[in-house]
Amino acid sequence: MNIRRKNRLWIACAVLAGLALTIGLVLYALRSNIDLFYTPGEILYGKRETQQMPEVGQRLRVGGMVMPGSVQRDPNSLKVTFTIYDAEGSVDVSYEGILPDLFREGQGVVVQGELEKGNHILAKEVLAKHDENYTPPEVEKAMEANHRRPASVYKDPAS
């Protein structure tokens, strides 16, 4: 092999190694910023497709409805705890900060935070439903999937 070919080979190897390193670093950086979307039922029972449940300490977004009667505010701080639910289950949420003006019981919310033991979410951000016609696409899709059940499931057994 002549010297010119060796130099080209070394340059090609260096470029490929640099490209592989760059791709690896970008994927590592993106992995730490990805928040997966779950419903309360998916946190309890796993995603429908894979039955994989989120791990404790995982960052995630959870969408559902604020359970009526569940909002508890600490009178000495901005700490708030509440429960969000869907058709399959409910999870407790703790948040410290100012809640959106549209936040209230029975309203749709998306919380962003970290999963703790006991299916408890330590929220870093709370997003409330904008108006009576707006639903975040992830929440709309999840709620539609949760409510696609036969009418007999929802009938009152006393009737």
UniProtKB/Swiss-Prot annotation:
UniProt keyword Transmembrane helix, yes or no: yes
Main localization, broad class: membrane
Superkingdom classification of source: Bacteria
Localization per record: Cell inner membrane
Organism: Escherichia coli (strain K12)
The protein, known as: Cytochrome c-type biogenesis protein CcmE
Keywords: Cell inner membrane, Cell membrane, Cytochrome c-type biogenesis, Heme, Iron, Membrane, Metal-binding, Signal-anchor, Transmembrane, Transmembrane helix
Outcome following mutation: H130C: Can still form a covalent bond with heme, but blocks heme release transfer to cytochrome c
Span list, region Disordered: 132-159
Transmembrane intervals: 9-29
Protein family per UniProt: Belongs to the CcmE/CycJ family.
Function comment: Heme chaperone required for the biogenesis of c-type cytochromes. Transiently binds heme delivered by CcmC and transfers the heme to apo-cytochromes in a process facilitated by CcmF and CcmH.
GO biological process annotation, one example: cytochrome c biosynthetic process
Record text on subunit structure and interactions: Forms a ternary complex with CcmC and CcmD. Interacts with CcmF. Shuttles between CcmC and CcmF for heme delivery.
GO molecular-function terms, A-Z: heme binding; metal ion binding
Record topology, Periplasmic segments: 30-159
Lineage: Bacteria, Pseudomonadati, Pseudomonadota, Gammaproteobacteria, Enterobacterales
Membrane association type: Single-pass type II membrane protein
Annotated positions binding heme: H130, Y134
Cytoplasmic membrane side: 1-8
Biased segments, Basic and acidic residues type: 132-147
GO CC terms of this entry: ATP-binding cassette (ABC) transporter complex
